[in-house]
């Protein structure tokens, strides 16, 4: 049984931890609002970019001048998985659920006889995936010193991905991230980057498409837009991740604060019981000594 001093020290330690978790919750809540606004603002732009690509692709048709970023290599033997996670922990299962989702995808591709390469964006994803798939990780990018994600960060990743594709290092590229739904809900998501998946984007009807005139030509515009679209989709993923991370962190720190409060109550109760028992024992000894006299 711990002594009164040990219990007192433990209570003080838990109270100090509770102050930290409470402060972290407040910081996460403040950052969440900004991150959520940024993620929600990026969605319409990202979706509209896909619609524009779909419209131009419809106008181009099957022209030979279309970039291979749009059409692909014609094969799907080598897959590059761009896995986006956070740089830090203390955010519940946020990072682990993205890594687990990507890990399951890797296993299914390997089982199908495909070659898999992994590009880790974020420290936590790298730390998780390297244990099982360290040999498959070909590239990694971290933003430890970045306080707020900027488009330049996404563009850096996009340029590396496009460079790898131009060198013939993969056939298909898929982006993994966590889509922010609410403070307690972040959904692991996979989005194909290369070949550009614009089939689901709302394209204009043929009558509406006829009014557009492209200069110098639709194929050239499409070739310029596709690399930017890749950067835009990665930027959206990073913003969604930032909002999801703050939401998960706020929830995790709230749970930790409440758990610390419950532990303090239990330890305080144990401390008071032991202290009362000690006082009672001392009183009995005093009374017994007085009677002996």
Curated annotation (Swiss-Prot):
It is found in: Cell inner membrane. Disulfide bonds: none annotated. It comes from Allorhizobium ampelinum (strain ATCC BAA-846 / DSM 112012 / S4). Produces ATP from ADP in the presence of a proton gradient across the membrane. The gamma chain is believed to be important in regulating ATPase activity and the flow of protons through the CF(0) complex. Keywords: ATP synthesis, Cell inner membrane, Cell membrane, CF(1), Hydrogen ion transport, Ion transport, Membrane, Transport. It comes from the Bacteria. The lineage of its organism: Bacteria, Pseudomonadati, Pseudomonadota, Alphaproteobacteria, Hyphomicrobiales. Pfam families: ATP-synt. One of its GO terms (cellular component) is plasma membrane. InterPro entries: ATP_synth_F1_ATPase_gsu, ATP_synth_F1_gsu, ATP_synth_F1_gsu_CS. The keyword Cell membrane applies. It is a peripheral membrane protein. This is ATP synthase gamma chain. F-type ATPases have 2 components, CF(1) - the catalytic core - and CF(0) - the membrane proton channel. CF(1) has five subunits: alpha(3), beta(3), gamma(1), delta(1), epsilon(1). CF(0) has three main subunits: a, b and c. One of its GO terms (biological process) is proton motive force-driven plasma membrane ATP synthesis.
């Amino acid at each position: 049984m711990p002594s009164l001093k040990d219990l007192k020290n433990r209570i003080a330690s838990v109270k100090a931890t509770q102050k930290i978790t409470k402060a972290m919750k407040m910081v996460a809540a403040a950052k969440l609002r900004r991150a959520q606004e940024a993620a929600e603002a990026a969605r319409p732009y990202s979706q509209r970019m896909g619609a524009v690509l779909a419209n131009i692709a419809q106008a181009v048709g099957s022209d030979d001048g279309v970039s291979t970023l749009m059409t692909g290599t014609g094969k799907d033997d080598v897959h590059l998985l761009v896995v986006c996670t956070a740089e830090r922990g203390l955010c519940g299962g946020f990072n682990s659920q993205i890594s687990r989702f990507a890990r399951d995808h890797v296993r299914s591709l390997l089982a199908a006889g495909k070659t898999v390469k992994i590009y880790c964006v974020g420290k936590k994803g790298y730390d998780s995936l390297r244990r099982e798939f360290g040999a498959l990780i070909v590239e990694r990018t971290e933003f430890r010193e970045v306080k707020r994600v900027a488009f330049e960060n996404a563009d850096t990743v996009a340029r590396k991905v496009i460079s790898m594709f131009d060198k013939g290092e993969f056939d298909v590229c898929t982006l993994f991230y966590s889509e922010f739904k609410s403070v307690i809900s972040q959904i692991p998501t996979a989005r194909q980057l290369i070949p550009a998946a614009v089939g689901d984007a709302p394209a204009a009807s043929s009558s509406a498409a006829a009014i557009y005139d492209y200069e110098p030509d639709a194929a050239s515009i499409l070739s310029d837009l596709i690399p930017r679209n890749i950067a835009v989709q990665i930027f959206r993923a990073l913003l969604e991740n930032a909002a999801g991370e703050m939401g998960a962190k706020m929830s995790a720190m709230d749970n930790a604060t409440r758990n610390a409060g419950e532990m303090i109550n239990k330890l305080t109760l144990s401390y008071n019981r032991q202290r009362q028992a000690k006082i009672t024992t001392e009183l009995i000894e005093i009374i017994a000594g007085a009677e002996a006299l």
